Amino acid sequence: MIVISCNNTKNETYNLAEIKNLQKENDSLKNMLLPNNVPMKNQINTFLTFQDNNAENAMNFYVELFDNSKIIEVVRWGKEGPVEEGKIMHATFSLNGSLFMCSDSPPIHNWNFSPAVSNYIDCENESELERLFSKLSENGNVTMPLNNYGFSQKFGWVIDQFGVSWQLNLQ
């Protein structure tokens, strides 16, 4: 026979922000524990193709900027490659639990990144929103300044120094 006593339990209530933060941390930890942290088959990941050999600089910038982020794998071009030796053939990294990939494109295309596709971040608080907005817009372009546009407390849209588009929101 098993007897469980619950006489000394405290009834604590967590607000929505605390629950959301715990879920985010849990999801991030689960992603970090995947075998070798490489993308699984059929998993959808963002792949950033850089045409100006900025893949490594961009990846390092993002990993340093976002919490719970790390570089997982980097495969470089060799001497016989179509681009300068040592440039990124493909790399995998995580940003707060989300997997991304990038490369330095060997052929130069007549296209680049477009703000029609952007990374969207629901920020935890105003401090995080302003910090990310400030860092991402540094040497980039502000598409929509931080403001209340009627659909959330505060929203901003930037194109960073590497041409990648970011929408930052605070509910």
Regions inferred by a protein language model and the residue ranges of each:
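A generic structural micro-feature
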Residues: 38, 83-89, 111-113
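Short beta-turn/strand-loop junction motif enriched in small, turn-promoting residues
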Residues: 79-80, 105-107
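Bacterial Sec signal peptide processing site at the extreme N-terminus
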Residues: 7-17
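Conserved, structured core segments of small domains
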Residues: 89, 98-106, 112, 149
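Vicinal oxygen chelate
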Residues: 17-44, 48-50, 72, 94, ...
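Conserved catalytic motifs of the protein kinase core domain
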Residues: 43, 88, 116
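C-terminal motif of bacterial Sec signal peptides marking the signal peptidase cleavage site
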Residues: 2-5
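Core segments of cupin and vicinal oxygen chelate
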Residues: 25, 49-97
